[in-house]
Amino acid sequence: MNKLETLQSALEARNDEILGYQINIDNYTRAIDKINVEHADNPAMIEFRDRLIEMLESHKTEQLKTIIIRDVIADQLTEMEAP
């Protein structure tokens, strides 16, 4: 596998990773909202919600890191494919 093929593969992997983070972000956000509405009086669920909030922030940060790396890979591909 040459550099171009490696970068193309890496770009696809980063896009999949970004999507995975987004699915988790969406799920955590919905779960937090659901707990706030339906289980606000349950201490165990509030504790779970608080852990979800921490995980949500962590996934947002990790997604941003992945976006940065994806963009750098895309820039390299553009440079390599330019005439």
Please describe what each predicted stretch is:
Residues 19, 23, 57, 64-66, ...:
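Extended rod-forming repeat segments used as scaffolds/tethers
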Residues 38-64, 70:
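Acidic, low-complexity, intrinsically disordered interaction modules
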Residues 1-26:
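Short, charge/polar-rich alpha-helical segments
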Residues 63-83:
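Long amphipathic alpha-helical coiled-coil segments
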Residues 1-9, 40-42, 47, 83:
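Short, charge-rich amphipathic alpha-helices with coiled-coil/heptad character
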